[in-house]
UniProtKB/Swiss-Prot annotation:
Monomer. Mitochondrial adenylate kinase with a specific GTP:AMP phosphotransferase activity. Could also use ITP as phosphate donor. Its physiological function is to recycle GTP into GDP which is necessary for the TCA cycle in the mitochondrial matrix. This is GTP:AMP phosphotransferase AK3, mitochondrial. The gene is AK3. The lineage of its organism: Eukaryota, Metazoa, Chordata, Craniata, Vertebrata. It comes from Pongo abelii. It catalyses: a ribonucleoside 5'-triphosphate + AMP = a ribonucleoside 5'-diphosphate + ADP; GTP + AMP = GDP + ADP; ITP + AMP = IDP + ADP.
């Protein structure tokens, strides 16, 4: 089956540590579509001091979640610049009201959901330790320091970011699940949800790749490259 000539409107979902960033990056390398990350968009608007950026920063500074209407305005404003392209939304929608607002503006064709067991994600995230002065990152499983808890170059102690501590990771994963469950159910009912389950990104990726080959053209310079 050949890729459809119609522009693709896609969303990618996955918990923190699910490999969503890696998969999104591979998708944009192999396929002709624009990747729109709500996190990058947010940082860019805050940096440029746009109206939405200033508004979002005020909520973040108070330790509050950015309201649905602000996130929706941010995403829809940017999507207006991408009407001629296929696109992949990453980090939006995160809540049911956001999904419904997006639906009123665009017909979503497919939602790629990366389903990685929480225990695997917990191991991935809690294995990360950093050397604060240099920003060097170690992973206890894939890239361990020569001496446990010590930076290879300076001999200084490594620390674990608050976000990477087991209790924080569990809270983040639970919050993600609570927030996105209604969104996944919403897309499931619409018949556009495609869930890819696995514990390793490299093993999940070929299935995502094969699925998208039927949906969107490949980039010409990468068309002959094996994923």
């Amino acid at each position: 089956m050949g890729a459809s000539a119609r522009l693709l409107r896609a969303v990618i979902m996955g918990a923190p540590g699910s490999g969503k960033g890696t998969v999104s990056s591979r998708i944009t390398t192999h396929f002709e579509l624009k990747h729109l990350s709500s996190g990058d968009l947010l940082r860019d608007n805050m940096l440029r001091g746009t109206e939405i950026g200033v508004l979002a920063k005020a909520f973040i500074d108070q330790g509050k979640l950015i309201p649905d209407d602000v996130m929706t305005r941010l995403a829809l404003h940017e999507l207006k610049n991408l009407t001629q392209y296929s696109w992949l939304l990453d980090g939006f929608p995160r809540t049911l009201p956001q999904a419904e607002a997006l639906d009123r503006a665009y017909q979503i064709d497919t939602v790629i959901n990366l389903n990685v067991p929480f225990e695997v994600i917990k191991q991935r995230l809690t294995a990360r330790w950093i050397h604060p002065a240099s920003g060097r990152v170690y992973n206890i499983e894939f890239n361990p320091p020569k001496t446990v808890g010590i930076d290879d170059l300076t001999g200084e102690p490594l620390i674990q970011r608050e976000d990477d501590k087991p209790e924080t990771v569990i809270k983040r994963l639970k919050a993600y699940e609570d927030q996105t469950k209604p969104v996944l159910e919403y897309y499931q009912k619409k018949g556009v949800l495609e869930t890819f389950s696995g514990t390793e990104t490299n093993k999940v990726w070929p299935y995502v790749y094969a699925f998208l080959q039927t949906k969107v053209p490949q980039t010409s310079q990468k068309a002959s490259v094996t994923p």
